[in-house]
Swiss-Prot record:
Pfam families: FAD_binding_2, Succ_DH_flav_C. Belongs to the FAD-dependent oxidoreductase 2 family. FRD/SDH subfamily. The modification Tele-8alpha-FAD histidine is found at H85. This is Succinate dehydrogenase [ubiquinone] flavoprotein subunit 2, mitochondrial. It comes from Arabidopsis thaliana. The active site is at R327 (proton acceptor). The keyword DNA repair does not apply. It is a peripheral membrane protein.
Length: 632
């Protein structure tokens, strides 16, 4: 069927031998495989206790935890770990440390439930917020260089949607940070720890698909080594997906170009659902024309949004929280200002973020990164003039449905929480759901470390290091190779870039900050046609080695899967909740729509099911927060 090299992994030495064998293969198989000839692809087999896909914050934290528990762990990543998108996170990580004032994780939980517009699962939110202080102290012990107060404590800044005493005690200072480069500091710290614990990295390996057996158990993944064109089957007792979001489905996004929803699409192709994809966060302050992120921490340090008339307009929309209202509230308010003619610039299509009233030492010490970013991408000296900003796609609240252990779940019969054996997910790829319909700023870095760690702990509960694995089925990975071969030999008339641009325009125009039945129905029709056009894609490079044309085309298919499910899920949800704002259904409808959307991918068609929100907490340490009007 195909040439196969088996690489045992009972020792570190055998894996390095396998890497040597793999590095030599291109000498003997330099000609690319013929179209349709699966036997000409060379497969290298690996066996591990656990495999992590993705080396951002969630993937690295999972890998560290697995290694700490003694598991032989592989981490597959399509780019070098410290180039993962976690590096772009700026503002910080939330935890009720109480360094700036009295704080309580229950207050943090309340803010997160409220921020989620009551679509978040309260058991998972309780777990995350309760674990937050421990997670941050652990990062400090790992060596993360947090900013400090004068007395040496971790400095914490104000962030949107954060309060004291369940919303009645004023603004909370809960966001621990390393200036405005917290993600950079976090990622490098975790990578150092992963190296210390001897995690085996497979860098520049593009994960193609999950390896699922006939009883629905995940047994690993199959991946393409971009360096030499070989295919690799990673057989593992546990597979953890930490592949990030799919922001690049939109035309303007703060996401890196590598954020293509690969793990989501792998899950969808395996016949499993994706949850709540209609909830896409628009960050209020992307630089106009560039989309680069200006952290919410800029407003946390005292930055002010103004319209073309110089008015602090957020005072009208959120009289209490003002510029630090929840992100969906601020983004909608900004969009309304522009619609009503109070935008700035020749086209009146952006607003201003003022920082020039802040002391220069604050900008230098607390916001050095965005000061530099504004100078490069907007030509602005933040000490003298405002930054032109516009809401920009930033985060996907939806993703692969999981419980608070990180185990992937699906709808099976009458069980809405059926666990998929052997498969876990963490980070932006996952939907635990701790963010619900809207994520609070600085809860994302918390999410990745808490649930990356949770995945590792759960593996340790259900699996033993060195445990014998059930053999792979004979055809394991065959469909993935057929998929790869089909795309590599695509000979249509449309370049990948044109189809991608069409998709991005449809998503930007039809699934934006405000939505209507008309725009969403049109969006469903257009995105379906865009998917159909993918059948006419042309891949000009047939090689297997460093073939960026091939990789981008596979990433495009992954994006299209996410985009189609997003659009159809949004069209179906007849209410406004969090980031899903309908102009024709302006109210939240708890009676009919307090439920999670499950989108299934069926050969180009989207099928929707639903599962209930978890309203019960884990224990009696905190009571359930019942739904109420969401006001800031």
């Amino acid at each position: 069927m195909w040439r196969c090299l088996r690489v045992a992994s009972s020792s570190r030495r055998s894996e390095s031998n396998g890497a040597f064998i793999t590095s030599q293969l291109s000498r003997f198989f330099s000609a690319p495989p013929s179209a349709g000839d699966k036997s000409s692809y060379t497969i290298v087999d690996h066996t591990y206790d656990a495999v992590v896909v993705g080396a951002g914050g969630a993937g690295l934290r999972a890998a560290i935890g697995l290694s700490e528990h003694g598991f032989n762990t592989a981490c597959i990543t399509k780019l070098f770990p410290t180039r993962s998108h976690t590096v772009a996170a700026q503002g910080g990580i939330n935890a009720a440390l109480g360094n700036m004032s009295v704080d309580d994780w229950r207050w943090h939980m309340y803010d997160t439930v409220k921020g989620s517009d009551w679509l978040g699962d309260q058991d998972a939110i309780q777990y995350m917020c309760r674990e937050a202080p421990k997670a941050v102290i652990e990062l400090e012990n790992y060596g993360l260089p947090f900013s400090r107060t004068e007395d040496g404590k971790i400095y914490q800044r104000a962030f949107g949607g954060q309060s004291l005493e369940f919303g009645i005690g004023g603004q909370a200072y809960r966001c621990a940070c390393a200036a405005d480069r917290t993600g950079h500091a976090l990622l490098h710290t975790l990578y150092g720890q992963a190296m210390k614990h001897n995690t085996q990295f497979f860098v520049e390996y593009f994960a193609l698909d999950l390896i699922m057996n006939s009883d629905g158990t995940c047994q690993g993944v199959i991946a393409l080594n971009m360096e030499d064109g070989t295919l690799h089957r990673f057989h593992a007792g546990s597979t953890i997906l930490a592949t990030g979001g799919y922001g690049r489905a939109y035309f303007s996004a703060t996401s890196a170009h590598t954020c293509t929803g690969d793990g989501n699409a792998m899950v969808a192709r395996a016949g499993l659902p994706l949850q709540d994809l209609e909830f896409v966060q628009f960050h209020p302050t992307g630089i106009y024309g560039a989309g680069c992120l200006i952290t919410e921490g800029a407003r946390g340090e005292g930055g002010i949004l103004r319209n073309s008339e110089g008015e602090k307009f957020m005072d009208r929309y959120a009289p209490t929280a003002r510029d630090l209202a929840s992100r969906d509230v601020v983004s909608r308010s900004m969009t309304m200002e522009i619609r009503q003619g109070r935008g700035a610039g020749p086209m009146k299509d952006y607003l201003y973020l003022y920082l020039n009233h802040l002391p220069p030492e604050v900008l230098k010490e607390r916001l050095p990164g965005i000061s530099e970013t504004a100078a490069i991408f907007a030509g602005v000296d933040v000490t003298r003039e405002p930054i032109p900003v516009l809401p920009t796609v930033h985060y996907n609240m939806g993703g692969i449905p999981t419980n608070y252990h990180g185990e992937v779940i699906t709808l099976r019969g009458d069980d809405p929480d059926a666990v998929v054996p052997g498969l876990m997910a963490a980070g932006e790829a996952a939907c635990a759901s701790v963010h619900g319909a809207n994520r609070l700023g600085a809860n994302s870095l918390l999410d990745i470390v808490v649930f990356g760690r949770a995945c590792a702990n759960r593996v340790a509960e259900i699996q033993k290091p060195g445990e014998k694995l059930k053999p792979l089925e004979k055809d394991a990975g065959e469909k993935s190779i057929e998929w790869l071969d089909r795309i590599r030999n695509s000979n249509g008339s449309l370049p990948t870039s044109k189809i991608r641009l069409n998709m991005q325009r449809v998503m930007q125009n039809n699934a934006a900050v405000f939505r209507t039945q008309e725009t969403l129905e049109e969006g469903c029709d257009l995105i379906d046609k865009t998917w159909d056009s993918f059948g006419d894609v042309k891949v000009t490079d047939r090689s297997m080695i460093w073939n960026s044309d091939l990789i981008e085309t596979m990433e495009l298919e992954n994006l299209l899967v996410n985009a189609c499910i997003t659009m159809h899920s949004a069209e179906a949800r007849k209410e406004s909740r969090g980031a899903h704002a309908r102009e024709d259904f302006t109210k939240r409808d708890d009676a009919n729509w307090m439920k999670h959307t499950l989108g299934y991918w069926e050969e180009g068609n989207v099928k929707l099911e639903y599962r209930p929100v978890h309203m019960k907490t884990l224990d009696d340490e905190v009571d359930t927060f019942p739904p109420k009007p969401r006001v800031y």
